[in-house]
């Protein structure tokens, strides 16, 4: 699927400075009238589970080998990126199943609180400990019934559907929608969106129009009267801070039919029926996940972490997809190699491949695999990251465009475009990196 990342906090980065910067002892006691800085507790950033710290650095971004077919010069650019945390492996079926199960169980608990299914209000929290009303949300401390009554059983049954032909009873994946909200800090910080017109420019030669109408674009999603999901991009005059809060409703179940639809005239029914559902594939990378689903997973993962850390935690850097520059910087390793490994060959001295890809025309098994492989069976790169080439391609947050690296900044570069529902398909394309098990060497 992809790897998530967490940005290193600025303070944690400052704590690691050494070498050319030397060391400086903080003053214990300041003299009267002197600026000595505020005191504070030392901070050590804990390592997020399953993630590797990638220190800040420089890379030449872009293809090292020029286009051999057309002889066109491929752009390269020197860029610098700040430090961040990155998952050491691709997201597995097991990890993504946890997300799907969370969505399923939240829907079930909400339904058990519905009068149509017994109306047990203890499955929802509607007020705080002081008795003040809050936005209704699921009470996860309330266990699901082990011996459901008739109404509760109907709630359970409502999440499943039966194939009228085969009689198979399966989860109704169409119901597995996850709703989340993301505050756009970047848009909110832009001067052109300041609520006070006087703050929109520092140029005193510019005459401020206090009646200027500033338009803002935001995403929203809701259920209509028929229970259908409606997704819209709204353009309206800026009115307040809520204009920077975007709402999404995303169906989270992966497209298991990709095994059939992406491979014409191939016998892949086994993977269609088993790859995501069978525990034997738990440690394999999840596939069939859209860019929207990948972002929803990151949002859920952030929310899940916050709930696990408890109410004393006010803020953490949220999980997100890496930018294309961050991904490439991490994949190249500490020595910024052409490949995630240390040489230009695809096999080691013993003839073993460094990654899971398509070694030869029609020959998928030459590297020991037919389809995807379990994560982390190949050696990691020098950053401690597995499968940065091959196995499955990975989503980034960066827009795919022909301008590519030339259009990016040389400082924490990326290209972002929040495509509206009605935008043409070409504006919705995102960059994927790393190649996959079905791609030739040139794609990795």
Predicted regions mapped to residue ranges:
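Functional-site microenvironments in short loops/helix caps that host divalent-cation chemistry
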Residues: 24-31, 53-54, 60, 65, ...
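A short glycine-rich, aromatic-capped structural motif
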Residues: 43-119, 132-133, 137-140, 144-278, ...
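Sec-dependent N-terminal signal peptides
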Residues: 7-14
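N-terminal pre-domain segments of enzymes
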Residues: 24-44
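Charge-dense polyanion-binding interfaces
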Residues: 116-126, 347-351
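Positively charged n-region of N-terminal signal peptides that target proteins for export
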Residues: 1-4
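C-terminal motif of bacterial Sec signal peptides marking the signal peptidase cleavage site
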Residues: 17-19
